[in-house]
Every structure is written in structure tokens, then in C-alpha cells.
Amino acid sequence: MADGSSLLFRLHLEGVDIGSRADDQAKAWRKHSDDFVSLFYDGHHCFTSLLAGDRAANEKLLDNMREFIAGDRKGWNKEVTAKVGVPLVEGITAFADGDYDKSVDLLQPIMSDVLTMIPVKKKSWN
């Protein structure tokens, strides 16, 4: 799902009319709004929901992330969701809303963490 979502987002950023193609992707992501398996996937879920115009799914993802980090779980996933995941989703959302200053303010401090999550970037280091 991540590859399809990424392609749609890149095409959208290039000005290509993707029509309703993001709708099916967003629908598939909705099933994973509380998985917290990977921030890489959470980011894709976020921008695909926004591309499809599904603000409710994006807000649910963000609410679930906040609930996850507020809970009594311990460990790396909770810490990285708090440090990187929530700002990542908030930053993507701000970008989609056209609030570029806010997007930069949220994303700039976590960029080095975000870059370590990108599989293509990891492959290019080898």
C-alpha cells in the first residue's frame, strides 16, 4: 500500500490529476489506524487520507497515536511515536492545509529521524 500511496502523492505534487484514485488507498489504510507498526506507514496513511479528502480518518489516526502515547505502554515504539510520529502526521496535515510555515516548524526538528525510516534512502546508503 505504501508504494501506491507514495506514487499518488508524488503525482499529485507534480500537478497530475489523480481523480479519485486515492479513495481506494485511503479506504485500505483505514483498517490500520491503530496498528502503530511503523511510522513510515502512519505517514503514508496520513497523506493518503488527506489526498482522498478523508479528514476524519486522518484525525482518527492522530487521535489514536496520541491515545497510544498517553497510555501505560512502555518501550521504543511509544517513544518514537511521541517524538517523531505525532509531529510527522501533524506536519503532513499542516502541509496539506497550506500552512507551510507550521509544516516546516513541525517537520524540520525530526527530519533526521524521518530520513532513517525511508526504505529507498536506506537502500541508497549501501
Tell where the protein language model's regions lie, with residue ranges:
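Long, positively charged binding patches that form subdomain-scale interaction surfaces
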Residues: R55-N58, M65-F68, V80-L88, F95-D97
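Long, internal scaffold/assembly segments composed of regular secondary structure
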Residues: M1-K31
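"A position-specific structural signal for the A-helix of alpha-solenoid helical repeats
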Residues: D3-R10, G43-H44, T48-L51, V84-I92, ...
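Structural motif corresponding to the intra-repeat A-B loop/turn of tetratricopeptide repeats
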Residues: L11-E14, A52, D97
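TPR-repeat structural position
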Residues: V16-G19, R55, Y100
